[in-house]
């Protein structure tokens, strides 16, 4: 049995009882990485020397009885678009291959203050643009359940590392499903918090009105512990909300009697695999037995979500990624004839094809002749999508459906057709456009591949999302299943 088969609270108890040391936990993480990393390839950069030194320092503190934080001394993996002082941050892009940040993201400051130990930086789709982690500029991460399949994206490394037992938990980011979709594919728990619940300061921006940092874990309780530490207002992020952070772990009562669940007909219709649909219906039966009720509803504008998202996200990306020009940091071409040529050559050589595709799409949507027809109209449709959610939440506590239309697909299966790849996020994207919280929890298997159940909540009501997810988890054993590597 691995140490990481224990939950956060169990590991905390083991540390308090001196049955294991923090150094033991860090050793276990690097031992497991040495054992499976060649197959999974979740990590881009390891932080071994600093992690072992910090473990020794924290063991000394623990011996004096100084620390009681549940995350104290626990190893964590960090998606490589979250800046880490003194630890290379690449966004899985060649244009940032040598970027060494001089500051920590706010979430890193909070994790460090809580005593978590960064094991390394995790692979992703370049600049978080992708649904399979095949767009990484450096390596291909594989799904621990089937090494011929993708782990999802863009936080594929974050989900694969947790599923493979390399770390007990990790941080990812979610712009259109990039935490929930890989969590579903890898059979782990992933939460996209409400927009503004977690500071984005130090998250390398893709689409600033959509991005959110969130936790990926083995259990719902672990997820709640991690969100507890990273959530809260931040003066460095004007979009972070000054709303009190409740005790998420206390919300895990197991009691969902009288809970009203909405199930959008659009989320179980065309394009959703029958086996996935059956897994979700079986999950709803479990929740019914626990005292909840569910009814079918409609989110009528969700059919426009994909087009709306790709116009808005690409437009924001084209502006955000303008800063990568070879002048201040990162890759710079050696072939430039003049300054303008340096900009062109650096960006052409440094960005991958998917990033360039989205920059071009966004630039086109923002151009003067097309702004009203595309960008402005997409913003109006986004408002309608948000209203759909608000209308449903007037009568229901949560919305439930599948996280993804299918289980994990094979490596290379969708790379030649961007639209087919984009369709994979069709059930997660509306949540980002509405800004509401949502979690993916394991709810079954299809041919040995995990299926994810998506539970969507009201703005800043992560507590109810967690309560429902935890009740379902405790009534089933899907979260206890592990891949064999």
From Swiss-Prot:
Quaternary structure (record): Heterotrimer of A, B and C subunits.
Gene3D superfamilies, per database record: Amidase signature (AS) domain
Protein name: Glutamyl-tRNA(Gln) amidotransferase subunit A
PANTHER family named in the record: GLUTAMYL-TRNA(GLN) AMIDOTRANSFERASE SUBUNIT A (PTHR11895:SF151), TRANSAMIDASE (PTHR11895)
Active site residues of this protein: 79 (charge relay system), 154 (charge relay system), 178 (acyl-ester intermediate)
GO MF annotation, one: glutaminyl-tRNA synthase (glutamine-hydrolyzing) activity
The keyword Nucleotide-binding is annotated on this UniProt entry: yes
UniProt similarity note: Belongs to the amidase family. GatA subfamily.
InterPro entries tied to this protein: Amidase (IPR000120), Amidase_CS (IPR020556), Amidase_dom (IPR023631), AS_sf (IPR036928), GatA (IPR004412)
The keyword Protein biosynthesis belongs to this UniProt entry's keyword annotation: yes
NCBIfam families attached to this UniProt entry: gatA
Record-level GO cellular component terms: glutamyl-tRNA(Gln) amidotransferase complex
PROSITE patterns recorded: AMIDASES (PS00571)
SS bond partners: none
Biological role stated in the UniProt entry: Allows the formation of correctly charged Gln-tRNA(Gln) through the transamidation of misacylated Glu-tRNA(Gln) in organisms which lack glutaminyl-tRNA synthetase. The reaction takes place in the presence of glutamine and ATP through an activated gamma-phospho-Glu-tRNA(Gln).
Cross-referenced HAMAP family: GatA
GO biological process per UniProt: translation
Catalytic activity: L-glutamyl-tRNA(Gln) + L-glutamine + ATP + H2O = L-glutaminyl-tRNA(Gln) + L-glutamate + ADP + phosphate + H(+)
Keywords from the UniProt entry: ATP-binding, Ligase, Nucleotide-binding, Protein biosynthesis
Matching Pfam families: Amidase
Entry superkingdom: Bacteria
EC number(s) stated in the UniProt entry for this protein: 6.3.5.7
